[in-house]
Amino acid sequence: MLNTAREIIDVCNERGIKIYDLVLEEEIKNSHTTEEEIRKKLDAVIDVMHASATKNLTQSDVTEYKMIDGFAKRTYEYANSGKSIVGDFLAKAMAMAFSTSEVNASMGKIVAAPTAGSSGIMPAMLVAATEKYNFDRTTIQNGFLTSIGIGQVITKYATFAGAEGGCQAECGSASAMAAAALVEMLGGTVEQALHAASITIINVLGLVCDPIAGLVQYPCTFRNASGVINAFISADLALAGVESLVPFDEVVIAMGEVGNSMIEALRETGLGGLAGSKTGQKIRRDFLKEGD
């Protein structure tokens, strides 16, 4: 397992390799398989991501509680209208994040990368960026492998679980993984990939997990949409030469410490934050009544 970001940088620079090379070597060793087989499995995962990110752009899944239905379709239509403030590329990326969130909420097939609650971020980044830059499959696979390396460092120091570390741990981690993957796919350095991951987490440090009625829908879907934007802007900054003063290892340690300091009501219990609002509590009561 890749232990620290510092170790990753040192080994990659010493050997003249990239993060995805290290991840591949480790997977081949641990799973006793071949690179060809690993890349074949990655293709299957990427296909599921593409399907979830695009499914609801022109239709709407119907979820049981209808809290987020139609967000993807509306945002996609707006992105194509030429009126978007942030431009059609970022607006479409948000629509793609919404799409996967809707698929998840309607019990469809998604890839938890790294969690179901943050499952819209990586697919939206991969699909939107591929449409823009026309990445080939190997480049996409290498980006995905890079994200795995970032995730391994996060799990060493912190957690992916909102119930342990808040939404910073879920969407923050997903965004960091996506940002590093994008830097790799665009030809950035190992250091730039890690700076992008650091900046991404810094942007959401302290973000709480407060799902209304305990359902992974609202406000989760907005945090997936903003999460993919976070990944894009953080990758942009890193590729521009902007560096994180605090190295990635320390950023993740800080995220873990912040998560540990959060009160229980703000860690996926459905009690605090928006879940504790009057509207949130009413929805929760209605939800519990339906379950009786």
UniProtKB/Swiss-Prot annotation:
Q: In which pathway does it act?
A: Carbohydrate biosynthesis; gluconeogenesis
Q: Which family does it belong to?
A: Belongs to the iron-sulfur dependent L-serine dehydratase family.
Query: In the UniProt record, what gene is named as encoding this protein?
Result: sdhA
Free-text comment on the cofactor = Binds 1 [4Fe-4S] cluster.
Q: What is the protein named?
A: L-serine dehydratase, alpha chain
Q: How does it assemble?
A: Heterooctamer of four alpha chains and four beta chains.
Q: Which reaction does it catalyse?
A: L-serine = pyruvate + NH4(+)
Q: Name one GO molecular function term.
A: L-serine ammonia-lyase activity
Q: Which cofactor does it need?
A: [4Fe-4S] cluster
Keywords, A to Z, come to: 4Fe-4S, Gluconeogenesis, Iron, Iron-sulfur, Lyase, Metal-binding
Query: What EC numbers are recorded for this enzyme?
Result: 4.3.1.17
One GO biological process term = gluconeogenesis
